[in-house]
Regions:
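Short glycine/proline- and aromatic-enriched beta-strand/turn motifs that initiate or cap beta-hairpins
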Residues: 24-85, 122, 274-276
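Outer-membrane pore/translocation modules
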Residues: 51, 56-58, 85-207, 215-217, ...
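Membrane-embedded beta-strand positions in outer-membrane beta-barrel channels/transporters
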Residues: 72, 76-78, 119-121, 161, ...
Length: 281
């Protein structure tokens, strides 16, 4: 299964047509002009924008008795800053990104934050245009993730990641991401057994653009079918808004860095703010 996933990822990442090598290329100038106009339209979008989903949700354990120790608020903010237009080699562009996730114990005395996870990085992306259509995006990125804690609560690792997105239709996107880990945290040497080596999933919008459904499976280290599962279902508040009422389900390990070895099955409800286009994962 791992081999099939890697083959699929490679196809997505390198599936850019190479002219004049066993292909019949017709009206190449016109096709190039169309591709340039697509990139120009994408480059005209704001340099600063949302990256991954931003959300604020609260909930409790699924399949157990809720109490103040297993009920919490979880929120995430995520944004990116594009540094260039897509005029670097291979029509790629450079960008910075930052994601911060928090687990907040709002039912305990003094409302303490249980864990804060910081995920900055830099990426190089290329839009994939085939047959005069935008069909995907390929990205290589360097990212860091840590929780800013000291002593035995400290968690930290780095990743060189390869990611691909395939835009199957205007309302359906499949995504995959594989990372080469560099684990530098003293107290999370075995993090791959819980937080995984690669992930795959999809994002789908209803035809009326009111509903959005995400599903991501994160494969943990090992040959067993051991996945962390994240499912999100959102309903758009109004037609012209990027705000949704969301139900989020998490099942598995690695939901936060501090508790990466702990199994969680949580259901949460709240507000989702997502990009106008498909989200990044």
């Amino acid at each position: 299964m791992k081999l099939k996933f890697i083959i699929l990822l490679i196809v997505v990442l390198v599936g850019v047509p190479v002219p004049a090598r066993g292909q019949i290329v017709t009206d190449s100038k016109s096709s190039k002009q169309i591709a340039d106009s697509i990139r120009a339209e994408l480059d005209s979008r704001p340099y600063f924008s949302l990256y991954k989903d931003t959300y604020f949700v609260g909930g409790t354990v699924l399949g157990g008795t809720p109490d103040k120790y297993n009920s919490d608020v979880k929120f995430q903010i995520s944004f990116q800053q594009r540094l260039t237009k897509s005029n670097l080699p291979w029509n790629s562009y450079l960008y910075l990104f930052y994601t911060q996730k928090a687990i907040w114990n709002v039912l305990e005395n003094s409302l303490p934050f249980h864990d804060l996870n910081f995920n900055p990085g830099v990426g190089l992306s290329k839009y994939i245009i085939m047959k005069d259509k935008l069909v995907g995006k390929a990205t290589v990125m360097i990212e860091h993730e840590s929780n800013g804690r000291a002593g035995t609560a400290s968690r930290s690792w780095n990743k060189v990641s390869l990611a691909g997105e395939a835009y199957i239709s205007p309302s359906l996107m499949a995504h995959a991401k594989y990372w080469i880990p560099i684990v530098d945290g003293k107290y999370n040497r075995d993090i791959l057994r819980y937080s995984g080596l690669y992930q795959a999933g999809f994002q789908a919008m209803s035809l009326d653009d009111k509903w959005v459904l995400d599903m991501t499976l994160v494969k943990r280290k090992g040959w067993d079918l051991n996945f962390n599962t994240i499912v999100q279902l959102g309903y758009r508040i109004n037609h012209n808004s990027n705000q949704f009422i969301m139900l989020q389900y998490y099942n598995g390990y690695g939901e936060s860095l501090l508790d990466f070895k702990q199994y969680h099955s949580r259901i949460r409800f709240g507000l989702l703010i997502r990009p106008r286009f498909f989200s990044d994962f």
